Amino acid sequence: IQKLSNKSEVAELFHQNRETIESEALWFNMEKQLSVRRMITADHLDTMTKWMYDWWGKAENYSYEAVYSYMLHSLQGKRLPQTYGLFLDETLIGMYQFTMEDLFSRPDIYPWLANVYIDKAYRAYGYGRFLLNSVKKTAEKAGLKELYLFTTHEGLYEKFGWDFIQEIDTFLEPRTQRLYRLDTNSRLMSR
């Protein structure tokens, strides 16, 4: 396997061959440059706030300031919510959160994986796979025994060890979505 010298070469090669590459060596080269961490700067906070405001803040009639406050408080301390950034070297390219509440109609289940996001410029390069593969280990380190999520994606989260529980009425649009659970004590392998 050719030694790749920079992140753009790795990303481009992976993008060109993403359907056929099975090489662990290439994936390892990508992983050396990718990290998931909570060390977030003021610039990162601004970026994450913009992502979340554009994604759901506007649609749910939240002000930018309200989303900023939510994001700021999800970066502090060891309690939930907790926000994790996906970094390509030092560039923030994605994120996810562990929260106590994500679905208003189901306060009986928690904690949640929420706000899984990859910056549009970095989609289709395999970074989402890396991000989702990190969830279980990160949750274990945070002391979480299980996680829940709801989504319209069918077949995606199963690849990362999530178990489909049932279809649920979210009272959102779309109303019917899929509820999943991840046992952080079970073995995780992406397919």
Where are these regions (language model features)?
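Conserved beta-strand in the GNAT
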Residues: 83-85, 91-101, 112, 117
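Conserved active-site alpha-helix within GNAT-family acetyltransferase domains
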Residues: 141-145, 151-175
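A short beta-loop-alpha structural element at the N-terminal edge
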Residues: 33-48
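Helix-loop element at the rim of GNAT/NAT acetyltransferase active sites that forms part
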Residues: 42, 49-63
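Conserved acetyl-CoA pyrophosphate-binding loop and the N-cap/start of the following alpha-helix
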Residues: 122, 126-134
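N-terminal amphipathic/hydrophobic targeting modules at extreme N-termini
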Residues: 4-5, 10-13
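Active-site rim helix/loop that mediates acceptor-substrate recognition in acyltransferases
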Residues: 57-84
